[in-house]
């Protein structure tokens, strides 16, 4: 586009590759700097090439509020900032909102960097992604904080060139299908875990270079691993050298003070109704999709973007007298529309905790157009249940079964995320009831239930081997736990469970309707046993039975819809996983008997605090 067209589309909220115009660009042997600061009294470029404030480079402003200057002295790798004279006369140093790289902390300067035009070698993956999509594919996500998965020999966070050598083989070995990273965009404080951003196009220096991350993604794709990233378009860090009140007025944030300030997180909220902000944010999302070949974006804190009263501070109703943030609603629909028009097989996932807005319904039906949303209700209910003494679980059995009332209202991801293993909530293993043996048994049971329940899957790092302590953002995982036999067996169990999930289409082929689910018994409160069948579109099925008390149940009998010879294909109490069973249940033939609405029954021993999953080895005539 011409500069005139760039400015016009930016102003109407339709410039979706804003980084091609704003920011710093190599042009005819010089570097051109452009920044949007419509109400600034003056803007200058300062940096290594101006001896910082000693020889500032004056910028000129156009009618759209964009300031521009060219430098013959600037070189790639130089540090720079904008010296902004705000409306009112205050002079502040600001980052470049469009910078693609920033200096190593504690510095906050932007870096002049020309991104390489990578010749990608992941064509097989990208072609398969386009051909097969993802809705009817297995999705089992390993959630990672790149700075604390594993430290290098000097105790520093690994860069992505190092993670390529260590994390990718681990993902492959553990049979995950995708890896999701907590924010990789530039952020000044590790304590925020990356969720208070300052650079929406800048790769976080701590983790290496943009080129290293490109190579990491390519290597993941070559190993059949998809890559997702977290992205935070609702709020941003309020540091004075970042986006906050960039030109002295509400530039990126709302003009209304209470709407601008996020009291819960000590951040500032984007003005999602402002056209220029829409161009900025949608350009950021597309940049990560296109430049890094990522396979999906998880949008953080969607509820904060949808509801005016979600925050802890004062709020005002909209023009209709209710609590909906109409600008947020329309922005999210626009975001998903733009991305799906260009990249229909990139996953858009919402972290959203309410049930009043249709998150994954299509745009034509009035939904927001996301592909998936995290099932926060299921997660809260199920963790509360598994923490409870089994003696009382029969009275709270609805915590396990309630999800079947709404499971297909949205397309869900069943997430045990980082949020559940911090701030005194305890690690996944430590949440479980009982002594050490029963804690591991409960965790195996829980993970089997997650895998068999409709919905895509996500597990935070460290939870796969039963790390005992909570996650600490400034330390690596407790890999030393794997010196313990029980943790080793827990890791082996998760690895085999992940492969079990991939191998059985019944668990992922139909995740969005009762065509893939048949409830056998959700009323057995007295024994606290839940049973259901998962089905695929070819007629195959798995019978899934969960004993949620530490009482073994010999000759447990259940109705089944298909006569046949059944084989146990998963038993969470096997000795190799840390249990006490040396052998599986024997292959078992159904009996002709009436059980509820079924004409055939299957009898077997149900392990204490265990899950037992069966497949039909041979069908018999009814």
Swiss-Prot record:
Catalytic activity: Transfers a segment of a (1->4)-alpha-D-glucan chain to a primary hydroxy group in a similar glucan chain
SMART domains given in the database record: Aamy (SM00642)
One GO term describing the cellular component: cytosol
Top-rank taxon, per record: Bacteria
EC number in record: 2.4.1.18
Active site as annotated: 300, 351
A molecular function (GO) term: cation binding
InterPro entries according to UniProt: A-amylase/branching_C (IPR006048), Branching_enzy (IPR037439), GlgB (IPR006407), GlgB_N_E_set_prok (IPR044143), Glyco_hydro_13_cat_dom (IPR006047), Glyco_hydro_13_N (IPR004193), Glyco_hydro_b (IPR013780), Glycoside_hydrolase_SF (IPR017853)
Keyword check for Transmembrane: no
GO biological process annotation, one example: glycogen biosynthetic process
UniProt keywords, alphabetically: Carbohydrate metabolism, Glycogen biosynthesis, Glycogen metabolism, Glycosyltransferase, Transferase
Pathway involvement of the protein, from the record: Glycan biosynthesis; glycogen biosynthesis
Pfam families: Alpha-amylase (PF00128), Alpha-amylase_C (PF02806), CBM_48 (PF02922)
Similarity section: Belongs to the glycosyl hydrolase 13 family. GlgB subfamily.
Family matches, as PANTHER family: 1,4-ALPHA-GLUCAN-BRANCHING ENZYME
Record text on subunit structure and interactions: Monomer.
Function field: Catalyzes the formation of the alpha-1,6-glucosidic linkages in glycogen by scission of a 1,4-alpha-linked oligosaccharide from growing alpha-1,4-glucan chains and the subsequent attachment of the oligosaccharide to the alpha-1,6 position.
Protein's name according to its UniProt entry: 1,4-alpha-glucan branching enzyme GlgB
Organism (species): Streptococcus agalactiae serotype V (strain ATCC BAA-611 / 2603 V/R)
Gene name linked to the record: glgB
């Amino acid at each position: 586009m011409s500069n005139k067209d760039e400015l016009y589309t930016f102003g109407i909220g339709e410039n979706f590759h804003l980084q091609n115009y704003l920011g710093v660009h190599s042009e005819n042997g010089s570097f051109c700097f452009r920044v949007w600061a419509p109400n600034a009294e003056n803007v200058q470029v300062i940096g290594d090439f101006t001896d910082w404030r000693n020889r500032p480079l004056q910028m000129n402003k156009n009618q759209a509020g964009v300031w521009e200057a060219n430098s013959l002295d600037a070189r790639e790798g130089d540090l720079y900032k904008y010296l902004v004279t705000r409306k009112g006369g205050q002079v502040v140093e600001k980052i470049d909102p469009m910078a693609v790289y920033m200096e190593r902390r504690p510095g906050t300067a932007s870096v002049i960097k020309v991104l390489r035009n990578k010749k990608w070698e992941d064509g097989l993956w990208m072609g398969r992604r386009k051909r097969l999509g993802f809705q009817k594919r297995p999705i089992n996500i390993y959630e990672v904080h790149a700075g604390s998965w594993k430290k290098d020999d000097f105790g520093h966070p690994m860069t992505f060139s190092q993670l390529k050598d260590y994390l990718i083989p681990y993902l492959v070995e553990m049979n995950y299908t995708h890896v999701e990273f907590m924010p990789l965009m530039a952020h000044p404080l590790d304590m925020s875990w990356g969720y208070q951003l300052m650079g929406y196009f800048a790769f976080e220096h701590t983790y290496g270079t943009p080129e290293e991350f490109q190579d990491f993604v390519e290597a993941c794709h070559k190993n059949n691993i998809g890559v997702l990233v977290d992205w935070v378009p609702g709020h941003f860090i309020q540091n004075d050298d970042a986006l906050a009140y960039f030109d002295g007025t509400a530039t990126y944030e709302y003009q209304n003070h209470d709407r601008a300030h996020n009291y819960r997180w000590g951040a500032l909220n984007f003005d999602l109704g402002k056209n220029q902000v829409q161009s900025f944010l949608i350009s950021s999302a597309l940049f990560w999709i296109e430049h890094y070949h990522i396979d999906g974006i998880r949008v953080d804190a969607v509820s904060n973007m949808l509801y005016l009263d979600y925050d802890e501070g004062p709020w005002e109703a909209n023009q209709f007298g209710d609590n909906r943030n109409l600008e947020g609603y329309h922005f999210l629909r626009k975001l998903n529309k733009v991305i799906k028009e260009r990249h229909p097989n990139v996953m858009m996932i919402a972290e959203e905790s309410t049930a009043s807005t249709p998150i994954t319904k299509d745009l034509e039906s009035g939904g927001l157009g996301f592909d998936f949303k995290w099932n926060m209700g299921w997660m809260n209910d199920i963790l509360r249940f598994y923490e409870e003494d089994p003696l009382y679980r029969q009275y709270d059995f609805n915590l396990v079964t309630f999800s079947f009332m709404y499971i297909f209202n949205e397309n869900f991801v069943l997430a045990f995320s980082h949020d559940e293993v911090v701030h005194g909530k305890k690690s996944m293993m430590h949440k479980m009831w009982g002594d050490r043996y029963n804690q591991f048994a409960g965790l195996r049971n829980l993970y089997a239930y997650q895998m068999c329940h409709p919905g895509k899957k996500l597990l935070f790092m460290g939870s796969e081997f039963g790390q005992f302590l909570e996650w600490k953002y400034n330390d690596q995982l407790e890999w030393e736990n794997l010196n313990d036999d029980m943790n080793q067996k827990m890791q082996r169990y998760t690895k085999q469970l992940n492969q079990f999930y991939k191998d059985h289409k019944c668990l992922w082929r139909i995740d969005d309707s009762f065509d893939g689910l048949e409830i056998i018994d959700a009323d057995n409160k007295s024994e606290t046993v839940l049973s259901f069948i998962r089905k695929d579109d070819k007629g195959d099925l798995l019978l899934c039975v969960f004993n949620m008390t530490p009482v073994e149940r010999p000759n447990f009998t259940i109705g089944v819809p298909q006569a046949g010879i059944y084989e146990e294909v998963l038993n969470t109490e096997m000795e190799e996983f840390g249990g006490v069973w040396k052998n599986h249940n024997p292959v078992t033939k159904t009996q002709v008997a009436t059980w509820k609405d079924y004409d055939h029954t299957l009898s077997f021993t149900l392990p204490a605090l265990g899950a037992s999953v069966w497949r039909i080895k041979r069908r018999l005539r009814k």
